Amino acid sequence: MPRRLPADIPPFPRGLSTLLVAALALLLAVSPSAPSGVLPEAAPALARAVPAGGLRPQALLPLVTAPATGGAVLTPERYEELDARVARTIADSGARAGIAVQDLRTGATFSHGAQEGFATASVAKLMITAMLVLHARDEGRELTAAERSQVEAMIRYSDNDVANGLYERIGYNPGFAEGAERLGFTGTEPHPNGVWGGTLTTPADQIRLLRALYTEEGPLTADERAHIRGLMETVAPEQAWGVSAAAGPGDVVGLKNGWTPRESDGGRWLVNSVGYVAGPDRQYLIAVMSEGSRDYTSGVALTEELVTTVTSALEDPPGGHPAGRPGR
């Protein structure tokens, strides 16, 4: 029996949709900084065991369609405090990092370094998947059975050989650039030598991608979104770190991670996590990107600390206003 794919998110109410657009514009308005270098090559996947009691497979869980409750809007003072805390965490790690989070319950956003450029590593595979779907539709067809199998291997198991072939299929750099424009990216550039793992992107553009996958915005159809999300929600357990740190019991988590050591940075690690967390009490889009960690483990730890720091502050921050209860 075919696996049931998750349901799609319905349109936001008009007022909330307007608020979300305005909030996203504020998130994307962070002043840019110089982009990082690019990867010489993509590294093979590494495994990290998920602790006992960790994320369970989400294959049969529908995406939450009822609005999540709770959350709070950060006051300017609390926003500044959170920004300073995030900056200290990054500085203490010795790495460089950027994070963007959008709370779909309230429209609240937080970003730090959201316009900074980072090499994607395997996060590029999520963009390649969306672009492949658009490419097939332009040809008047759906993905073939072989393509669906390849995409599954690329997203769930981070297969690099498959990514090489699918990057060729979307048209290498010209095809990628066209797809980036259709998805609304403003700070994403393919590697000049066509190395997909060296694609330069920003946390802000990854939020744009997540909105294209999670909401009815963007060029993807409901069935196309559901297919890609179904793969993101069933990644191999050893790759289910990062964004999932924000999840509670029973929450739906969809993500794609990227990780690789960089010879050009003395073997220090680039570690990225992009995805969403949805449940009765939370509904987040999250993109966190980093480079310069001393090893894989510390890079994952930094990613998860940033995720939990920001989402915890958005849950019910001291001095914040619960959703629907503006300050006086």
Please tell me what each predicted stretch does.
Residues 107, 117-141, 154, 286:
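Active-site SXXK
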Residues 123-126, 156, 160, 200-207:
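Short alpha-helical patches at coil-to-helix transitions and adjacent helical residues
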